[in-house]
From Swiss-Prot:
It is an enzyme of class 2 (transferase). It catalyses: adenosine(2503) in 23S rRNA + 2 reduced [2Fe-2S]-[ferredoxin] + 2 S-adenosyl-L-methionine = 2-methyladenosine(2503) in 23S rRNA + 5'-deoxyadenosine + L-methionine + 2 oxidized [2Fe-2S]-[ferredoxin] + S-adenosyl-L-homocysteine; adenosine(37) in tRNA + 2 reduced [2Fe-2S]-[ferredoxin] + 2 S-adenosyl-L-methionine = 2-methyladenosine(37) in tRNA + 5'-deoxyadenosine + L-methionine + 2 oxidized [2Fe-2S]-[ferredoxin] + S-adenosyl-L-homocysteine. Disulfide bonds join 105-337. It comes from the Bacteria. GO terms for cellular component: cytoplasm. Its cofactor is [4Fe-4S] cluster. The lineage of its organism: Bacteria, Bacillati, Cyanobacteriota, Cyanophyceae, Synechococcales. NCBIfam families: rRNA_mod_RlmN. Its EC number is 2.1.1.192. This is Probable dual-specificity RNA methyltransferase RlmN. HAMAP family: RNA_methyltr_RlmN. Residues 98-334 form the Radical SAM core domain. InterPro entries: Aldolase_TIM (IPR013785), Methyltransferase_A (IPR040072), RlmN_N (IPR048641), RNA_MTrfase_RlmN (IPR027492), rRNA_lsu_MTrfase_RlmN/Cfr (IPR004383), rSAM (IPR007197).
């Protein structure tokens, strides 16, 4: 019996069902589980503990692993990967080192429909959702290439995670419960989709465990006019409505919300705009990540000076807003926030 659905992403009980359906004893599922998630195999024929005849019959069963077609290293040590999927499409993932930690920035969609004005991914449009195994594979690929255990995952690559929420939650379940990455080390970023933050809050659980990962909302503006310019979809989703959903999320989950704010020189980096932002977030259980703009070819936005960034952060702190400045580490490899877009025209694809 064959099954075209990749095995990567399945839980141990699901693998037990699959193994038994193949006419094998159920204990083989534990072996398969270990080889999938601890040894990160690409083909079932690699499982030496399986009977040879069965291994040979399993060669056509898809595990769900991608192929690295290019890797670019930034001066800071971050590595951007171009990964070829089963259908020939290319996605991007980034490995980001920090001391003894390794963070993976993963994609949740092939392309993105949000078309944010400062982001490279949206310039290429939306092609399709990624399946759970295609998300999980990005983490295993980086972990395997670095020969280092992944400690953190950020859903800040290609795509809008909440528009592919079922697959994202399925991937997080596996990454947490099967691969052993703590939920508190996982961040899911969104520009804000009407009703979807509430839907996420009401989910409450990931698999059989409480929802504990971090929600990061890409706010990027202190008022509706600037947000409409930067994020076209926000024209149908007022900031007041977005923030109310975020407040509901905090109340339902007990988890604070992180707000991402990209600083663009001369547009949203003025002291008075810091005060507007502080007013928006007053009384909110939240944290603000300030991200100085990362340049991309198609837009004219510039990164503010360090003095301007520091002044903006100080203005927020004076208003009792918790804030962190995030200087991107992937600039030299076009792997920083806002720069991810799989470039199939320049990637060297092996025959």
């Amino acid at each position: 019996m064959t099954d075209a659905t990749p095995l990567l992403g399945r839980s141990l009980p699901e693998l037990q069902d699959w193994v038994v359906a193949q006419g094998q004893p159920s204990y083989r599922a534990k072996q398969l589980y270990q080889w999938l998630y601890e040894r990160s195999i690409h083909n079932l024929a690699e499982i030496s503990v399986f009977p040879k005849a069965w291994r040979q019959s399993l060669q056509a069963v898809p595990v769900g692993r991608s192929q690295i077609v290019d890797r670019s290293v930034s001066p800071s040590g971050s590595i951007k990967y171009l990964l070829r999927l089963h259908d020939g499409e290319i996605i991007e993932a980034v490995g980001i080192p920090s001391g003894d930690r390794l963070t993976v920035c993963v994609s949740s969609q092939l392309g993105c429909a949000m078309a944010c004005d400062f982001c490279a991914t949206g310039k290429g449009g939306f092609r399709r959702h990624l399946a759970p195994h295609e998300i999980i594979d990005q983490v295993l690929t980086v972990q395997e290439d670095w020969q280092q255990r992944v400690s953190n995952i950020v859903f800040m690559g290609m795509g809008e995670p909440l528009l592919n929420l079922d697959a994202v939650l399925a991937a997080i379940r596996c990454l947490n419960q099967d691969i052993g990455i703590g939920q508190r080390g996982i961040t899911v970023s969104t520009v804000g989709i009407p009703g979807h933050i509430r839907r996420l809050a009401e989910t409450k659980r990931v698999g059989d465990r409480p929802l504990q990962f971090t929600l990061a909302v890409s706010l990027h503006a202190p008022n509706q006019a600037i947000r409409d310019r930067l994020i076209p979809s926000s024209r149908h989703y007022p900031i007041t409505d977005l923030l109310q959903e975020c407040r509901d999320y905090v109340q339902i989950t007990g988890r604070r919300v992180t707000f991402e704010y990209i600083l663009l020189a001369g547009l949203n980096d003025q002291p008075e705009q810091a005060e507007q932002l502080a007013q928006l977030l007053r009384g909110f259980q939240s944290h603000v990540n300030l991200i100085p703009c990362n340049p991309i070819d198609e837009v004219e936005y510039q990164r503010p000076s360090k003095a301007r960034v520091d002044a903006f952060a100080d203005a927020l702190r004076q208003q009792r807003v918790a804030v962190t400045v995030r200087w991107s580490k992937g600039l030299g490899a076009d792997a920083a926030c806002g720069q991810l877009r799989a470039n199939r025209s320049t990637a060297t694809l092996p025959a």
